């Protein structure tokens, strides 16, 4: 039986937000460069399936479907697991829609004999749901050096402290800091 790792990959502001109050995230893009692109490409290539909520799927689909290059290839060709109670059809594929019990469905994805990780692309609400349930095995967080003052955090309202160990970090030329963290168990 397989036990694939669930990795939550997100970019966050210095003050801990993944999106602005209106749900936008354009403030993060100026901090991306060749070195951070390589970091991201590696995680995408290791993925066996991209997991995301409906909003992320609807935002990412048109962008990546119209893009080219190694990152676009990794995003477009690998299967997507879309978690939604309202999405009826997933056109950016290959994709499978999950709308039931989150804990059971993540366990199903982890147990599949497919290769690679379950790479979760936030939104903050989906990320928060996974984190609250203790379903994330590894966090790959890139913090960009900008404070946005308010927004949506994947770590808001967890109910208890989430203690993490930093197992790797890399600083990019732009000043962004990527960290791999695992929950203390």
Which role does the model predict for each range below?
Residues 1-185:
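Enzymes that bind and transform nitrogen-containing heteroaromatic metabolites
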């Amino acid at each position: 039986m397989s036990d694939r790792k669930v990795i939550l990959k997100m970019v966050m502001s210095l003050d801990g937000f993944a999106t602005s109050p209106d749900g936008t995230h354009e403030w993060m893009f100026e901090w991306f460069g060749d070195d951070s692109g390589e970091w991201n490409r590696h995680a995408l290539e290791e993925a066996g399936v991209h997991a995301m909520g409906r909003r992320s799927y609807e935002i990412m689909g048109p962008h990546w479907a119209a893009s080219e290059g190694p990152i676009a290839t990794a995003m477009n060709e690998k299967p997507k697991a879309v978690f939604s109670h309202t999405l009826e059809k997933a056109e950016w594929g290959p994709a499978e829609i999950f709308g039931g019990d989150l804990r059971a469905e993540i366990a199903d994805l982890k147990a599949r004999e497919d290769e690679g990780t379950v790479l979760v692309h936030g939104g903050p609400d989906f990320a928060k749901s996974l984190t609250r349930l203790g379903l994330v095995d590894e966090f790959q967080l890139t913090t960009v050096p900008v404070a946005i003052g308010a927004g949506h955090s994947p770590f808001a309202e967890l109910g208890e402290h989430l203690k993490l160990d930093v197992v790797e970090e890399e600083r990019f030329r732009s000043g962004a800091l990527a960290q791999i963290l695992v929950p203390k168990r």
